């Protein structure tokens, strides 16, 4: 039989980079979202600012005031609604042998449509206050990947196409997206309203495009002749990529564009409702290689050469061109514009007691394979400058996930935090999906 696994690996391996996908900064619970509730007081004392619950009255500590801050951060997450952590470890990290039992575990979890996503971020930024306006500037790095794939696609990769002799494998849905870019941005936030409890903010950034790879298809299928003499690809598809023959975490510049972020919040004495719209923008990519087809295409070669580069991540332009052109599909090279993977985030948090705050929200990334991610968090203050933030979420590229945020402040100036999504990976890797972490260091003055 013909070696067709490289076709499907090409369509789905763009996500094979180390690295979920969004995270809320745990240090926010010691700063922007810090619990200001203090000891229970006599409700007749009118000197202190207070807030009352059904049974208790609390005093409110004065809000932390600061002129400027500086922060550096990094994060990497990977998640899937089908592939387990054990499989990800073997396939992506250790490159170890994937035995039949591990393959079958994945097959048993597969559905008609499966997804996987990777998000790697790093950056530094600062902010300074001018009267009631805060001006922000920063530099960020992002490598984002997502894919949807069918159960047949997985079987073709790891079992080959012998089982499909004389049959048609359904590769629908099949969509892949990978983008690597860096952003230099500036923004402002301003407090408005009669009660001075509404914050509006916006950022504008200039984007340096590094790498771009995208596959869109409709009704994709692959037929294998009974005697293995040929393959027939049926689909309407578009394949586009920048010509990166050697993988690099920071590719050469292949395009440029603009991006913007928008922020709104309204604040009560012990609660805040916020809406964020992030990464609204585009990149104009230069000299993008594109293959487009709509119909039936036959391949009669003896063997399909590996069209994935040596590191298993990027395309091999030479072998890819040979494969498509052998079926009569010619490439075009042109400049194209694509939108960035934007995110809508709605959240609400509330301080319940001096030691407990809760927050909940929903996050939606506008890419294939991502479903709205609903989450809830409980912030428990061991002290006023040390907080634990366990969370439970469902959605995104995965299913249910458990995370733990930890944040500690020192001398009211230094904040160190981390967010960990490793418990499922360690405790039950063969039954769970998704892992990652973030770290951040901030200095306020």
Where would I find each of the regions flagged by the language model?
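Bacterial Sec-dependent N-terminal signal peptides
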Residues: 1-24, 445
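N-terminal leader/targeting segments
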Residues: 5-13, 71-73, 433-435
């Amino acid at each position: 039989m013909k070696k067709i696994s490289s076709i499907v690996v090409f369509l789905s391996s763009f996500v094979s980079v180390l690295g979920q996908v969004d995270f809320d900064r745990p240090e926010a619970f010691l700063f922007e979202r810090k619990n200001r509730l203090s000891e229970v007081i006599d409700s007749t004392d009118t000197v202190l600012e207070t807030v009352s619950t059904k049974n208790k009255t609390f005093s409110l500590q004065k809000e932390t005031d600061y002129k400027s801050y500086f922060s550096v951060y990094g994060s990497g997450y990977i998640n899937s609604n089908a592939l387990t952590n054990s499989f990800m470890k073997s396939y992506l990290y250790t490159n170890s042998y994937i035995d039949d039992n591990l393959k079958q575990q994945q097959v048993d979890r597969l559905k008609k449509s499966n997804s996987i996503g990777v998000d790697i971020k790093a950056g530094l930024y600062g902010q300074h206050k001018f009267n009631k306006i805060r001006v922000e500037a920063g530099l960020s790095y992002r490598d984002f990947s997502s894919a949807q794939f069918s159960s047949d696609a997985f079987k073709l990769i790891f079992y080959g196409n012998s089982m499909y002799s004389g049959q048609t494998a359904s590769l629908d849905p099949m969509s892949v997206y990978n983008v690597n870019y860096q952003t230099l941005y500036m923004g402002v936030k301003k407090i408005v309203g009669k009660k001075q409890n509404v914050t509006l903010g916006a950022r504008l950034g200039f984007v340096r495009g590094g790498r771009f790879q995208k596959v869109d298809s409709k009704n994709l299928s692959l037929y294998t002749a009974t005697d293995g003499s040929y393959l027939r690809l049926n689909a309407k598809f578009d394949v586009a990529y920048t010509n990166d023959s050697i993988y690099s975490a920071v590719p050469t510049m292949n395009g440029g564009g603009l991006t913007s972020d928008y922020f709104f919040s309204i604040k009560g004495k012990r609660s805040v409702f916020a809406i964020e719209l992030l990464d609204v923008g585009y990149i104009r990519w230069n000299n993008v290689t594109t293959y487009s087809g709509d119909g039936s295409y036959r391949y009669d070669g003896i063997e399909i050469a590996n069209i994935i580069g040596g590191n298993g991540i990027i395309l091999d332009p030479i072998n890819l061109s040979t494969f498509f052109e052998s079926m009569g599909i010619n490439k075009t090279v042109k400049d194209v514009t694509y939108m960035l993977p934007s995110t809508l985030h709605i959240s609400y948090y509330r301080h319940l007691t001096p030691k407990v705050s809760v927050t909940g929200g929903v996050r939606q990334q506008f890419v294939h394979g991502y479903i709205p991610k609903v989450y809830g968090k409980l912030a428990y203050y061991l002290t006023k400058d040390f907080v634990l933030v366990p969370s439970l979420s469902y959605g995104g590229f995965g299913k249910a996930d458990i995370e733990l945020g930890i944040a500690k402040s020192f001398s009211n100036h230094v904040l160190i935090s981390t967010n960990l999504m490793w418990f499922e990976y360690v405790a039950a890797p063969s039954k769970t999906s998704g892992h990652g972490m973030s770290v951040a260091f901030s200095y306020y003055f």
